Design a protein with these regions (language model features):
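N-terminal cap/lid segment of alpha/beta-hydrolase-fold proteins
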Residues: 23-76
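Short beta-strand element of the alpha/beta-hydrolase
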Residues: 77-87
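Short amphipathic alpha-helix adjacent to the substrate-entry channel of hydrolases
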Residues: 96-114
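Alpha/beta-hydrolase active-site loop
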Residues: 128-150
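Primarily recognizes the serine-hydrolase "nucleophile elbow" in alpha/beta-hydrolase
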Residues: 143-228
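Short beta-strand/loop motif that positions the catalytic acidic residue
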Residues: 234-236, 240
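Residue-level detector of functionally pivotal "anchor" positions at catalytic/ligand-binding pockets or at interdomain
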Residues: 264, 306-337, 354
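C-terminal outer-membrane/trafficking sorting elements
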Residues: 328-405
């Protein structure tokens, strides 16, 4: 791989929420690392979260599978939840399709659930009804999980949602498309199919999403309001002919979502396969790759150090490489000045002849050198850079965030 993306935990900012600080712990939980072995992951299959009438008028039992660290092994009582929704064009697919991502996330310390939902439609605009029913069922599953948080050890303050294709569209709808917006776009739909917040079960719990794991999905045009925007990590093929990566007739694709978030100062991370079509990184290794990236992205939200990323390279997740310094070998405090910098950056606490690698904000390696009293930025464009110092002789593995003016 030509690029190494260094989006890692650079600074642990003061946190007012004790649980958030716990999730931002110095160990490898919620990183790309398999913190728990496969044997330490428990699961419960075919949990009934509700029932509802499908497009044929038949009552359908709605089920989910849930994966979580063994509560006899994990010291945490409550964990973040990631809800996954399968794809299939609202006519095919099943909850087992997202099993690999759920297991991978559970091994990293999350509670992960994958749901079944009502599929199918007859003709024409009834496809819109299928999309609406999927939204209803996703809401019902979240109400169920919030109501039963203690059973599965869920921290209801930290809920993330994701999916693939139709499932990613549904995940985005849950956050961005309100009942009022549905009613305006398709008058009478609530009267015909019921509301988003009462269909499927009688739970009345509310939920607050903290981020979205969007895999080749989209959101209806005009649904994204700045007040609703939350961090999103996305994966999409440049050549996708089914769900356009940009803006199509009625949908905003992943890249357009990415730019909309950035324009509103909301953290966003997107990986684009420049020759990819509909569905990228879809084999088992690819699913784990995406889940690992999502895990690190969510961790960055816990740690208040989320970074914007746009890449066309398959850069593996790497958030377990936090600052590591051998205290007896180097000073306790490393500092750099001036930062922001225009010309020369002086770094105290780093000995000469330490290896230096400079990356821009999207992971392009700009320069490799030895540290000798200063680092010169005069030949680099304005912007954010990550400067990595490595010196095995004294135990230094340190990353510094630098702004070039």
């Amino acid at each position: 791989m030509k690029k190494l993306l260094l989006i890692i935990n650079l600074f642990l900012l003061p946190l007012s929420n004790l649980v958030q600080a716990q999730f931002c712990s110095q160990d490898n939980r919620f990183t790309e690392i398999e913190y728990f072995s496969l044997q330490d992951v428990d699961s419960v299959s075919n949990v009934v979260y509700g029932s509802a009438i499908d497009y044929q008028g038949t009552t359908t039992t709605l089920k989910l599978d849930i994966y979580f660290p063994d509560q006899n092994v994990d010291l945490f009582n409550l964990r973040p939840l990631v809800l996954m929704i399968h794809g299939g064009g609202f006519i095919a697919g099943n909850k087992e399709d997202r099993k690999t991502e759920c297991i991978a996330l559970a091994q990293k310390g999350y509670v992960a659930a994958t749901i079944s939902y009502r599929l199918g439609w007859n003709t024409g605009l009834q496809r819109i009804q299928a999309i609406y029913r999927a939204h209803q069922d996703a809401n019902a599953s979240l109400r169920y999980l919030v109501s039963n948080y203690s059973t599965y050890g869920i921290d209801t303050n930290w809920i993330f949602i994701g999916g693939t294709s139709a499932g990613a569209i549904t995940a985005n709808n849950v956050n961005y498309t309100s009942q009022n917006e549905w009613n305006i776009l398709f008058p009478g739909i609530e009267t015909m199919l019921g509301s988003l917040d009462t269909s499927g079960n009688t739970y009345t719990n509310s939920f607050d999403l903290k981020g979205i794991f969007n895999n080749w999905g989209a959101v209806p045009i005009n649904s994204m309001q700045s007040s609703e925007m939350i961090p999103q990590i996305a994966f999409h093929g440049e050549l996708d002919q089914i769900v356009n990566i940009d803006t199509a007739t009625s949908l905003i694709g992943s890249r357009s979502i990415h730019y909309a978030l950035l324009s509103n100062n909301i953290c966003a991370d997107i990986t684009i396969d420049s020759v990819g079509q509909h569905g990228i990184f879809t084999d088992r290794a690819g699913a784990i790759f995406r889940a690992s990236k999502a895990s690190c992205f969510f961790r960055s939200i816990f740690c208040n150090d989320c970074q914007d990323v746009y890449t066309t390279d398959s850069i593996p997740a790497n958030c377990s490489s936090t600052v590591s310094i051998n205290e007896p070998s180097v000073p306790n405090k490393i500092s750099a000045y001036p930062n922001p910098v225009q010309e020369a950056l002086t770094v105290q606490g780093i000995p000469n002849n330490t290896n230096v690698s400079i990356y821009n904000s999207v992971g392009d390696l700009k320069r490799i050198e030895k540290y000798m009293n200063a680092i010169y930025f005069s030949d680099l464009e304005q912007g954010l850079y990550f400067v990595k110092f490595e010196n095995s002789a004294v135990g230094i593995n340190y990353v510094l965030k630098v702004l070039k003016e």
